[in-house]
Amino acid sequence: MEQTQKLKLNLQHFASNNVKPQVFNPDNVMMHEKKDGTLMNEFTTPILQEVMENSKIMQLGKYEPMEGTEKKFTFWADKPGAYWVGEGQKIETSKATWVNATMRAFKLGVILPVTKEFLNYTYSQFFEEMKPMIAEAFYKKFDEAGILNQGNNPFGKSIAQSIEKTNKVIKGDFTQDNIIDLEALLEDDELEANAFISKTQNRSLLRKIVDPETKERIYDRNSDSLDGLPVVNLKSSNLKRGELITGDFDKLIYGIPQLIEYKIDETAQLSTVKNEDGTPVNLFEQDMVAITCNYACSIAYR
């Protein structure tokens, strides 16, 4: 009977302290090889920077740094009343006092369909191309949720809901008296307006407002200010022409944990994204892919 000799290998011989683990290189990895994950910081940072520069909430409100999805902080409730912080958390105060509150971040998701050839881009090429589109989708959705309570608002509160609840509304044309009366609604609560939320379609209406005595216009088109206060223009069809919002936006706080998650899908039918004829986009039939991006953000109304 023949015996088979076994070759003894010294595995240590093949090991080397000089061998380094492979490092992910976004310039060499193709998107079809990395269809989901957490976006690298070098792409996350400029996207969030663009979001913060363009979001009306972020232009007007105060930024509160967040390391995780929850942030405890203290603020000065400078008058008795109710303060809303986070989703449905109502804090009642009977006197001016320091209040402890918790701000929680909730996920906002956006879906962007693109042609299938994008899968042949490198990771770097893909996200360089998609950065402005992802940022625009994020800040539009954030503002529509936090200001107008649109798009499955995850925060539980919005400026529109606060207006509806307090019924602090002036109805009528854009006149100097109505603008003054609108600001006076805040002054009744010992608050001062510090900005207006409008839209570009309102500019022609604002330019017609004239002081009946001095004949001066209270809207400055060069500085985009009304009655000396800055005007920011929200791009949303849900804010109608002839609607104008004012407030003390120092009471508005927001936070953004610094993570964006993404996933690419090739087969779904997108019920929220429509073709020109109104039919849902079918990725498989139309030879497209869609990237879904999620990021967490929070809003607190004091």
From Swiss-Prot:
UniProt keyword Repressor, yes or no: no
Keywords: Capsid protein, Coiled coil, Late protein, Virion
Principal localisation: virion
Protein's cellular compartments: Virion
Superkingdom of origin organism: Viruses
A single GO cellular-component term on record: viral capsid
Coiled-coil residue windows: 175-196
Keyword Coiled coil: yes
Propeptide: 1-14
Family (UniProt): Belongs to the HK97 phage major capsid protein family.
Its biological purpose: Assembles to form an icosahedral capsid.
Name of this chain's protein: Putative major capsid protein
Originating species: Staphylococcus phage phiMR25
Organismal lineage: Viruses, Duplodnaviria, Heunggongvirae, Uroviricota, Caudoviricetes
Gene designation: orf47
